């Protein structure tokens, strides 16, 4: 080291100026083929064999003077790299062949010392080169570093050390004797070498070395006492910006900014051994031995990265000559942050065995973590050991240390750091800092073979690296020749002899370990007098936390990305007292060295070839020698030319190039056994594939994904190649109501891969695509022009390219319209931000305004995007990617490219499909998520077990236990195991029991979502999800006027009046005419109180006018008597039963539907006539205006949800396309509803008198059959066996409860449609997880219903065992007069106003009978707001604030 002013005092004899020449280098596929180090000027540190740079004759050591006619002789390192990186074609450079190919140090901050006089030159400002520094920093951040061009090279780097061997003398032992302090050069004199006087001055000016020279005798003790050695990854170093000495928080934020910066740049870490000695921290590689050392007195503190706990930083301070902390003129401290990471993926012993062999040590079992001490699972043990070394540095550092420990989670998101040094030196400091800086060396391997014939000076200036475990070691390793080890001070002198020939630009400061030996603190006080040691073995706050086991912000945490790996939990290291004293000691006795060995002997020992570069076998014959090599320290020759960046080349070819294709990766990846150390002798460049980036762990896979989100913005084609990209793009399209585009494209892409000779498969797939996307009655039609429309006859001769034109149209539509909007969407922005910050990609369900809209009805990746695309016709739910019979090889070949075809459906086989067995064909696995297309067929949402689909998501996954995290109401959270075959309710019941929570009075939500989950789903779909459990209020409500009781579950925060009003309105009552009180009390209840006050209570509603209630009850009792005759007359399906129950409105609807009466089945007409007779006898015809008003209400509400693909949301603007319009015969009944309504009821609608008819004999009304809310399961028939819907089994009493009044066909149609819509809408975009899709679902839920005399157990589920949700096709069970409704069956009673009741308690023209019958026995209406209103509700759905939801 030298000061800026020292250069003027020394003679600098040297040869003539180096030869300057101009070269032109063409850019190859992997770049130009060279790496740089140093600055002012930059020097080539490595030239790859066979690269363009090698072809034009560039050699390591050449200086770059100009780039593309821009003088860069005085430019900084990063500016030169930026200039070269911007050049895309031929690179014009002017290079100077320095004497002996001299190479500069690679630190960014050093001035130029390569001109003849060696004066310190000012750095060339970036503006002179036309580079904006801010712009450069931003680009580096965005691109993840400025060396992308370097990483694209798949081959190994190889320096040109062989030609250099011809020019340089081979160093023999006889030649080594000429290396004396008085000699100025070796073979080629170096003009920048230090003189003998300067060496002496430098040594004596350094407080550390002066200690060693003044007190030789005190350092005869063993200096290699090692606390612990751990394998960590080194990312790089950044010099911290100067901060005011009284701003502790600013300093801490700057350090965290450094860690964030290096982490965001995605620099590939280099594995090093971090040896935490008793007085310093050493870094060693598997090739070069000790490459850096951080003395304890320079360790300011260490901190963990707040964003990613795997990363941690060591902060080193600079000290002045007197031992005090170095401060600049303004009083700011000069510090550097060195960033490391602990790779939890290496925790497993089997995984890191190869690394341990490479580093030459044996793993030490750690009983505390059941792992190996050298491979920690987190950064916590490393930081705990390092904290032991802290010295007292004054109040500032102590304050920063305290903040780092106690305030570690405080996020300092601003990045205050300067640009990182691009060549990632372990130290990055100013030239004039002399020996105060940390050693800067290469982390790569040696440039020459370490053998007897190797040259000791391959690449003058320290190109030759000392191999790990080479015989020349300190006083703790036996000398291979039997000579006594060196004394510490002699080692220091020997080291400076060597440094003399390294050149002044080489930053040299390796205080030998012997200078800080295991001297007790008492003796150290005399030994190190004046050196400012004042060692405090444990700072107060560190000691306190160590004793208490408190880890503050570095508490135990999980480092793995999935968050559930149990082995990754950080644990405290064992206390120092429990670690055996000899656990890390080198075995064997250590001879005391002679105190006065001649200097010439030191030199011979230091530089003799046999001593320096002796073969490894000479020192690894015994176990003791192996341990010596493991912890052998050496003096660490500096290798400035080999330092390039933090992305280091190690022994094995393991680096993945991010931009390389999968095929290239397969061919480029080299396994552990394929390369030997000899093959990698010249591998010192980051161009190679060699690193630990793809150690046998999932880390390699993670790196492949690191830039995947950014790659989506490269092109639309690139997006479609990434299954994850397709998934998020599908989510975006679903929000845009155009998901059918990507589904159609995927279907066509899959169709294109069907073999042309497989006519049967082609025909099947072609018809499926045509019927689903292209025909006039398509369920999910795509928007293509008329020229691309296909006629039915083309399906007779299908061929793989038949949909090419249509696919291209949709592709262009997505590419030029949807894709650009996707890149601007909050969903993509959130993804790219998560990738930059190293987080897992967000759940699109939780991204504001970007998740798959709650209006969408399907699951994650192939759902039916809007209600209008549903179909009510009986149709197979076949998906695009179900099994292809025996063509397993075909499936593997095709499925590799498309996320939606990777997981096969577990549907029936092709043979069963052909026989028409479509019951289970509605499962469509797409991108690992499920889609159901019940669409009116017998296949229902509930009849399919989600676990089937989930089992196909990752067939190659191991069977490891899966977990989810549930946040409980008390603020705690717990991890719950999920398993296929067990429903969510099953796993939730056990959790609720353990925590004393009534499972029936709780709802489960996704974190960030507001829809409760459907609890009968398979629990395996909750893997790695964050959920929250919310309590609900359960109470019983007795409706005395109608002799009914209901069990209700309500949101605790709702007022009593808001909960009760919609309930009583549902039963045709008016809350204002009722007296509300608790059972057993006479005082009226406060309707403004929160409903939580009624938890577990029994609330009674009585008529203020008893006579009115009696009359209403008498009317109801008279209804079923007439109905029984009609019900028992013949077997009826759901539609017939519904019509029998619609008395009030049937007559009015009849007039509207007169035109189409003749189209109905004759049998239906007879039924309708019988129903009409009953209606005429019992009721008068209601006002047509009211019916029209109700139709208008339904129409408006539904049109709000029938958002077509053009995005029209209002009925006035909605023009239905042809495929949604009904035939003219049923136009009077037409509602602007989706195709589900049009097609589901066009066959069944009452065109003659407006009433529903029974389905055709072959049709089954599945939604009602599977619903326990079916009329057949009304009170009195709740336990009837399954049969044709609506029939009353022979011998069983007909429904005779007071709620079995006939019902309007309109409400019936709405209810039937609601069943279809509900099933579709429950599958919300949340990874296939079903949620109850209702806007007010969390506010009020009907738990059960029965007579007033019914026991509580039939209305409210017992707290201990939550009520089981009936399966989709299971009939309800109960007793006569009472029944239990499934928990998650939702009936939306949106916004019921408190208008005065009409005749018999009806509301606004709707009869009381229909309203009550629907509430008791009718099927639920849809959870969609558009289907919410029922006949018993007013015509203004959005004018009231009262909401309720019945289950």
UniProtKB/Swiss-Prot annotation:
Domain called GoLoco: residue spans: 1187-1209
Chain ranges of the RBD domain: 962-1032, 1034-1104
Domain RGS, chain residue ranges per copy: 715-832
Record-annotated PDZ domain positions: 22-98
Biased composition (Polar residues): 413-425, 843-853, 1122-1136, 1244-1258, 1301-1313
Ranges of Basic and acidic residues composition bias in the record: 914-923, 1103-1117, 1151-1169
Crosslink (Glycyl lysine isopeptide (Lys-Gly) (interchain with G-Cter in SUMO2)) position: 196
Disordered, as annotated region: 1-21, 410-429, 443-482, 618-652, 843-941, 1103-1169, 1240-1447
GO cellular component: condensed nuclear chromosome; cytoplasm; cytosol; dendrite; nuclear matrix; nucleolus; nucleoplasm; nucleus
Keywords for this protein: Cell projection, Cytoplasm, GTPase activation, Isopeptide bond, Methylation, Nucleus, Phosphoprotein, Repeat, Repressor, Signal transduction inhibitor, Synapse, Transcription, Ubl conjugation
Phosphoserine modifications at: 172, 195, 661, 671, 850, 879, 943
Gene3D superfamilies given in the database record: 1.10.196.10, 2.30.42.10, Phosphatidylinositol 3-kinase Catalytic Subunit, Chain A, domain 1, Pleckstrin-homology domain (PH domain)/Phosphotyrosine-binding domain (PTB), Regulator of G-protein Signalling 4, domain 2
Tissue: Isoform 3 is brain specific.
Biased composition (Low complexity): 1267-1280, 1289-1298
PID domain segment(s): 228-340
GO molecular function: GTPase activator activity; GTPase activity; GTPase regulator activity
Keyword Nucleus applies: yes
Modified residues (Omega-N-methylarginine): 524, 633
Annotated localization: Nucleus; Cytoplasm; Cell projection, Dendrite; Synapse
A biological process from GO: G protein-coupled receptor signaling pathway
Pfam families: GoLoco, PDZ, RBD, RGS, RGS12_us1, RGS12_us2, RGS12_usC
Membrane-spanning parts: none
Subunit structure: Interacts with GNAI1. Interacts with GNAI2 and GNAI3; the interactions are GDP-dependent.
PANTHER family the UniProt entry points to: REGULATOR OF G-PROTEIN SIGNALING 12, REGULATOR OF G-PROTEIN SIGNALING LOCO
Name of the protein: Regulator of G-protein signaling 12
Gene that this sequence comes from: RGS12
């Amino acid at each position: 080291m030298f000061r800026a002013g020292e250069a003027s005092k020394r003679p600098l004899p040297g040869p003539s100026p180096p030869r300057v020449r101009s070269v032109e280098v063409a850019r190859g596929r992997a770049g130009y083929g060279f790496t740089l180090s140093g600055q002012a000027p930059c020097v080539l540190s490595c030239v790859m064999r066979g690269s363009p740079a090698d072809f034009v004759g560039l050699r390591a050591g050449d200086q770059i003077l100009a780039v593309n006619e821009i003088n860069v002789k005085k430019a900084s390192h990063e500016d030169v790299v930026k200039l070269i990186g911007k050049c895309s074609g031929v690179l014009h450079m002017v290079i100077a062949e320095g004497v002996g190919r001299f190479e500069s140090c690679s630190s960014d901050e050093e001035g130029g010392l390569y001109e003849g006089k060696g004066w310190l030159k000012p750095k060339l400002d970036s503006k002179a080169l036309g580079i904006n520094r801010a712009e450069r920093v931003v680009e580096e951040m965005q691109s993840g570093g400025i060396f992308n061009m370097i990483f694209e090279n798949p081959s190994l780097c190889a320096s040109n050390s062989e030609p250099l061997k011809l020019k340089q003398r081979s160093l023999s032992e006889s030649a080594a004797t000429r290396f004396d302090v008085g000699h100025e050069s070796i073979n080629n004199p170096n003009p920048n070498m230090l003189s003998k006087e300067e060496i002496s001055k430098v040594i004596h000016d350094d407080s550390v070395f002066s200690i060693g020279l003044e007190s030789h005798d005190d350092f005869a003790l063993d200096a290699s006492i090692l606390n612990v050695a751990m394998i960590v990854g080194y990312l790089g170093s950044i010099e911290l910006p100067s901060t005011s000495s009284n701003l502790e928080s600013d300093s801490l934020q700057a350090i965290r900014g450094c860690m964030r910066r290096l982490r965001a740049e995605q620099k590939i870490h280099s594995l090093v051994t971090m040896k935490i000695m008793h007085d310093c921290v050493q870094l060693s590689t598997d090739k070069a031995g000790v490459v850096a050392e951080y003395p304890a007195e320079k360790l300011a503190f260490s901190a963990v990265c707040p964003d990613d706990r795997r990363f941690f930083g060591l902060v080193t301070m600079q000290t002045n000559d007197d031992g005090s902390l170095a401060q600049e003129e303004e009083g700011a401290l000069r510090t550097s942050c060195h960033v490391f990471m602990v790779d939890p993926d290496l925790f497993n012993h089997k995984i890191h065995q190869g690394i341990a062999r490479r580093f030459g040590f044996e793993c030490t079992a750690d009983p505390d973590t059941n792992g190996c001490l050298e491979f920690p699972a987190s950064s916590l043990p490393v930081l705990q050991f390092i904290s032991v070394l802290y010295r007292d540095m004054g109040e500032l550092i102590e304050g920063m240390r305290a903040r780092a420990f106690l305030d570690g989670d405080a996020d300092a998101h601003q990045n205050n750091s300067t640009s990182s040094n691009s060549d990632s030196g372990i130290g990055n400091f100013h030239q004039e800092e002399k020996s105060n800086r940390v050693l800067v060396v290469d982390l790569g391997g040696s440039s020459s073979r370490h053998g007897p014939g190797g040259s000791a000076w391959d690449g003058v200036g320290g190109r030759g690296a000392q191999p790990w475990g080479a015989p020349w070691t300190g006083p703790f390793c036996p000398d291979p020749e039997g000579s006594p080890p060196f004394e510490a001070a002699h080692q220091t002198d020997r080291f400076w002899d060597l440094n003399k020939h390294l050149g002044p630009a080489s930053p040299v400061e390796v205080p030998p370990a012997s200078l800080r030996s295991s001297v007790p603190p008492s003796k150290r006080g005399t030994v190190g007098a004046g050196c400012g040691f004042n060692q405090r073995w444990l700072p107060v706050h560190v000691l306190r936390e160590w004793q208490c086991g408190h880890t503050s912000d570095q508490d135990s945490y999980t480092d793995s990305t999935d968050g559930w790996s149990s082995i990754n939990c950080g644990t405290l290291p064992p206390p120092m007292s429990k670690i055996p004293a000899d656990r890390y000691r080198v075995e064997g006795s250590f001879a005391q060295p002679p105190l006065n060995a001649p200097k010439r002997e030191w030199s011979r020992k230091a530089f003799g070839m046999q001593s320096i570069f002796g073969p490894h076998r000479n020192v690894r014959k015994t176990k003791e020698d192996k341990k010596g090599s493991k912890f052998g320290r050496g003096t660490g020759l500096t290798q400035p030319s080999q330092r390039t960046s933090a992305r280091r080349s190690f022994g094995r070819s393991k680096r993945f190039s991010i931009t390389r294709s999968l095929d290239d990766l397969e061919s480029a990846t080299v396994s552990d056994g394929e390369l030997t150390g000899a093959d990698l002798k010249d591998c010192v460049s980051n161009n190679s594939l060699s690193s630990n980036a793809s150690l046998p762990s999932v880390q390699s896979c993670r790196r492949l994904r690191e830039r995947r989100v950014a790659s989506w913005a490269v092109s639309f084609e690139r997006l479609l190649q990434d299954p994850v990209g397709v998934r998020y793009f599908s989510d975006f399209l679903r929000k845009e109501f155009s998901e059918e585009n990507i589904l159609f494209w995927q279907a066509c892409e899959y169709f294109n891969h069907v073999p042309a000779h497989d006519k049967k498969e082609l025909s099947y797939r072609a018809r499926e695509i045509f019927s689903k996307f292209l025909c006039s009655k398509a369920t999910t039609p795509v928007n293509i022009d008329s020229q691309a429309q296909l006629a039915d006859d083309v399906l007779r001769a299908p061929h793989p390219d038949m949909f090419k034109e249509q696919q291209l149209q949709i592709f262009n539509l997505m590419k030029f319209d949807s894709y650009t909007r996707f890149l601007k969407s909050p969903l993509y922005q959130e993804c790219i931000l998560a990738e930059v910050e190293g987080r897992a990609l967000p759940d699109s369900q939780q991204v504001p305004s970007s998740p798959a809209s709650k209006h969408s009805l399907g699951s994650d990746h192939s759902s039916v995007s809007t209600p209008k695309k549903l179909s009510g016709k009986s149709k197979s739910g076949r998906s695009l990617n179900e099994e292809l019979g025996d063509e397993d090889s075909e499936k593997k070949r095709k499925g590799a490219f498309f996320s939606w075809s990777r997981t096969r459906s577990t549907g029936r086989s092709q043979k069963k499909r052909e026989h028409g067995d479509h019951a289970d064909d509605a499962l469509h696995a797409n991108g690992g998520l499920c889609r159901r297309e019940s669409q009116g067929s017998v296949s229902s949402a509930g009849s399919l077990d989600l676990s089937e689909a989930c089992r196909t998501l990752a067939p190659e996954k191991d069977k490891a236990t899966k977990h989810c995290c549930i946040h409980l109401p008390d603020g705690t959270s717990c991890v719950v195991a999920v398993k296929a075959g067990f429903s969510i309710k099953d796993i939730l019941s056990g959790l609720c029991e353990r925590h004393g929570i009534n499972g029936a009075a709780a709802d489960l939500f996704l974190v960030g979502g507001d829809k409760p989950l459907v609890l009968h789903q398979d629990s395996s779909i909750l893997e790695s999800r964050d959920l929250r459990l919310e309590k609900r209020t359960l109470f019983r409500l007795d409706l005395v006027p109608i002799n009914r009781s209901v069990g209700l579950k309500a949101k605790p925060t709702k007022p009593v009046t808001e909960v009760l009003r919609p309930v009583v309105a549902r039963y045709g009552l008016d809350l204002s005419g009722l007296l509300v009180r608790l059972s057993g009390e006479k005082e009226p209840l406060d309707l403004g109180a929160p409903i939580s006050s009624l938890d577990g209570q029994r609330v009674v509603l009585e008529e203020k006018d008893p006579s009115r209630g009696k009359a209403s009850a008498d009317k109801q009792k008279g209804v079923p008597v007439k109905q029984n005759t009609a019900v028992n007359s013949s077997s009826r399906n759901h539609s017939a039963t519904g019509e029998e129950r619609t008395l009030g409105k049937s007559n009015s609807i009849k007039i509207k539907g007169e035109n189409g009466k003749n189209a109905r089945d004759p049998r239906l007409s007879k039924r309708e006539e019988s129903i009409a007779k009953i209606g005429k006898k019992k009721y008068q015809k209601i006002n047509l205006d009211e019916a029209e008003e109700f139709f208008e209400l339904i129409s408006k509400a539904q049109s709000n949800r029938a958002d077509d693909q053009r995005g029209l949301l209002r009925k006035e603007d909605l023009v239905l396309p042809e495929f949604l319009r009904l035939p003219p015969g049923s136009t009077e009944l037409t509602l602007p509803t989706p195709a589900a309504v049009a097609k589901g009821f066009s066959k069944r609608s009452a065109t003659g008198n407006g009433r529903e008819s029974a389905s055709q004999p072959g049709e089954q009304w599945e939604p009602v059959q599977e619903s326990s809310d079916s009329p057949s399961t009304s009170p009195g028939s709740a336990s009837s066996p399954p049969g044709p819907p609506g029939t009353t089994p022979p011998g069983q009493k007909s429904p005779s409860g007071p709620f079995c009044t006939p019902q309007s066909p309109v409400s019936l149609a709405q209810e039937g449609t609601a069943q279809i819509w509900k099933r579709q809408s429950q599958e919300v975009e949340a990874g296939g997880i079903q949620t109850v899709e209702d806007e007010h679902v969390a506010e009020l839920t009907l738990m059960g219903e029965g007579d007033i005399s019914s026991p509580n157990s039939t209305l409210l589920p017992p707290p201990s065992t939550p009520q089981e949700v009936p399966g989709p096709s299971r009939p309800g069970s109960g007793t006569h007069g009472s029944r239990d409704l499934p928990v998650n069956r939702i009936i939306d009673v949106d916004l019921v106003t408190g208008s005065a009741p009409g005749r018999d308690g009806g509301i606004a023209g709707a009869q009381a009978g229909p309203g009550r019958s629907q509430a008791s026995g009718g099927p639920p209406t849809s959870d969609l707001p558009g289907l919410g209103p029922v006949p018993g509700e007013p015509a203004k759905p959005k004018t009231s604030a009262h909401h309720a939801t019945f289950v």
